[in-house]
Design a protein with these regions (language model features):
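Extended, composition-driven regions rather than compact fold-specific motifs
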Residues: 1-412
Length: 412
């Protein structure tokens, strides 16, 4: 198409969109959604989608609930028709019968979400929409199927192939830096000076995953300290008066904070890919790095101690209790009770060391008496560790941690 043809087409589309927008003014949001599902033309579809998203953005909580209930109840599958098409496929499995079954099995709300996503910037709006939904679904279980469908779509839209790994440093745009301050979920960043100490020194790194449809919104980011040796205290790692080292002199990369940024992407895992990609990139850029570890919180430790059947003589043995908790406290499915442990062990890390008085902040003391843990990412053992953990529920740990755990006395 020539430049002139494109220009004429663009002018026509804009004028047509104005006409269509005027036509939407007298219709309800539900009517617009039905029209969008029945639309064929690209221009009309984009106009309808934009109108729906613009309306959603100014809805009250009750209006959003009404919209969610419409998507859940009115755009549901027809179970009887699904069974009918499945029976037809069983009798005569071919392309046509399978396609009929596949179409019957997909709720119309998935197609509505896809069509809404035609609008530039719609992906971020749909992520916010799911955030709103998650705030309601706990008290309204019938909205659960809508969440399942949105999560299914997001898992595809946000798969690793679409994500872009970007370094975040003191020279990054101010709006990105503001979001790092706001989204930091592990060790609060209290000021711009605090942020500068995390990003500017030569022995500090930060990386985030971004999506092309949300270029100014980090999805997840990890903060990294380059050190000599494995640290045993977050206070020392983040001390204001510490002396930075040259990155080339470091032998250890410490992942000390991982923050998910988008509540609407809950349940979509990015951390596994992020840590492995960052570790690989750092190993390439800094050949002197030989050790990759975390310095992680143990958020469930104190809650577990309140209900566990441990002998009184264990009191004060913070490192032993933490080791025992990480290795032995399990959910009914055999997975570790601690969510951070499940994450890192599922990634193929192992429990390397535990440290008392490692986080003396109010939050650190409240959740684990200040105890923290190093998870070691041995790049040559990640796959084997992952298989042991996922397949056999084996928590891979160092000998010192196993010894500490075994020293804990149980009530009889």
């Amino acid at each position: 198409m020539s430049f002139f043809s494109e220009l004429v087409s663009t002018i026509f589309e804009r004028r047509y969109q104005k006409v269509l927008l005027k036509e939407t003014e007298g219709k309800t949001t539900v009517e617009l959604a039905d029209a969008l599902l029945g639309s064929i033309g690209e221009v009309s579809g984009v106009t309808l989608a934009r109108s729906i998203l613009d309306r959603y953005a100014i809805m009250s909580s009750n209006e959003k609930l009404d919209f969610f209930e419409f998507m859940t109840d009115k755009l549901e599958i027809d179970p009887e028709y699904v069974i009918k098409t499945l029976d037809a496929f069983k009798i005569n499995p071919n392309k046509a019968t399978y396609q009929a079954f596949a179409e019957a099995s997909e709720p119309k709300r998935q197609e509505l979400a896809r069509r809404l996503n035609q609008v530039p910037g719609a992906t971020a709006q749909l992520v916010k929409l799911r955030k709103d939904l998650l705030g309601m679904v706990k008290d309204r279980p019938k909205l659960g199927p809508l969440d399942v469908d949105l999560k299914h779509l997001f898992a595809s839209w946000f798969n690793r192939g679409f994500l872009v790994l970007r370094p975040i440093n003191w020279s990054s745009p101010a709006d990105i830096l503001e979001k790092i301050i706001a989204y930091e979920a592990v060790h609060a960043i209290h000021s711009w000076d605090d942020l500068r100490l995390r990003l500017k020194p030569t022995d500090r790194r930060c990386f985030g995953f971004f999506h092309p449809s949300m270029p100014d919104e980090p999805l997840i980011f990890v903060e990294v300290a380059l050190t000599k040796g494995i640290p045993n205290s977050i206070q020392e790692l983040l001390a204001d008066e510490r002396d930075p080292i040259n990155a080339a002199d470091a032998d250890t990369a410490v992942f000390y904070s991982i923050s998910n940024c988008q509540a609407g992407l809950a349940g979509i895992s990015f951390g596994n890919s992020l840590i492995k990609q960052v570790a690989s990139d750092l190993a390439t850029d800094l050949p002197g790095l030989s050790t990759f570890v975390t310095l992680s919180p143990i958020p469930g430790l104190n809650r577990w101690l309140e209900t566990s059947k441990l002998a009184n003589e264990n009191l004060g043995q913070d490192e032993a209790l933490a080791a025992h908790y990480l290795l032995k406290a399990k959910k009914p499915d055999g997975m570790p009770l601690d969510p951070v442990a499940r994450f890192h062990l599922g990634n193929g890390a192992k429990v390397h060391a535990v440290h008392a008085q490692a986080d003396t902040s109010e939050n650190g003391v409240e959740q684990s008496n200040g105890t923290m843990v190093n998870y070691l990412y041995d790049l040559s053992q990640i796959s084997q560790n992952h298989e042991k953990f996922v397949g056999e529920r084996i928590v891979v740990a160092s000998a010192p941690v196993k010894t500490l755990s075994a020293s804990v006395k149980i009530k009889v």
